[in-house]
Regions:
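Acidic/polar, glycine-enriched structural segments that form the non-catalytic walls/loops
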Residues: 1-14, 18-216
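Carboxylate/His-rich catalytic cores and anion/metal-binding grooves
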Residues: 220-234
Length: 234
């Protein structure tokens, strides 16, 4: 019964990334690259450009994954080798639609420190399960990976604040740094093994048993009980 906007904001299929490059102690400009190598042989890497009121620059693979930024001083490049992104022989070649490696390139002037915001977006439309057919819940609110990016960039500060608030839950504890890292990694791995689906127009929250892609068995209930009571009391 939650409001539509609240559900949309909660189920966005995206990861929010801030990258800060501190070049304040250097007399030369410094460049950085953020990207990935496509692994789907049936979906080509591509440049993503759109309405400047939403986003300015991005790279993606097919229709299901992308990295997009709203910062103006970023260029996209598609290449066959990461070296060609960092040390391009001809910058014009970066704009070609060839190559299985895509990256966003940004530069910090000498004696400056800058931060960029990126939204790593995902999208799978249509039926996504066999046996019992289902769609991802977020497809009710987003129509494409570009749509996800536009919304994510518009509300980036909100998601950043939520992430900082979430970090305080563990950073304020008396756990060692090693245990804090392990706990944060475990929570993210747990969330990464979940699926929020729509089956017969009804929401269905599934927790898979990690890499096995099975629904959790009863013996794991004890392991999850304390986590669920804290994080998902419903």
């Amino acid at each position: 019964n939650a409001p539509s906007e609240a559900l949309k904001r909660a189920c966005i299929p995206a990861v929010f990334v801030e990258i800060t490059v501190d070049n304040s102690g250097c007399s030369k400009q410094r460049g950085a690259v953020f990207g990935f190598q496509g692994s789907d042989p049936y979906s080509s890497m591509r440049h993503i450009c759109g309405d400047t009121n939403k986003f300015l620059c991005g790279i993606g693979q097919g229709l299901h994954a992308a990295i997009i930024t709203g910062d103006k001083d970023v260029e996209s490049g598609l290449v066959f080798s990461i070296d060609d992104l960092i040390f391009p022989k001809n910058k014009a070649h970066l704009g070609f639609g060839l190559g299985n490696i895509g990256g966003l390139i940004f530069t910090v002037p000498a004696h400056e420190k800058k931060t960029w915001k990126f939204v790593v977006c995902f999208y799978r439309g249509g039926n996504v399960t066999a046996g019992t057919g289902s769609t991802y819940f977020y497809t009710q609110y987003f129509s494409s990976v570009e749509d996800v990016a536009a919304y994510g960039l518009l509300h980036f500060d909100y998601y950043r604040e939520r992430a900082v608030l979430s970090d305080k839950m563990v950073l304020s504890s008396e756990l060692s740094q090693e245990r804090i890292f392990s706990l944060c990694h475990s929570i993210r791995s747990y969330c990464g093994s979940t699926e929020f689906l729509l089956i017969d127009n009804k929401p269905c929250w599934i927790v898979n048993e990690g890499e096995y892609r099975m629904i959790n068995t009863l013996d794991l209930t004890v392991d999850h009980l304390f986590f669920e009571m804290k994080m998902n009391p419903w």
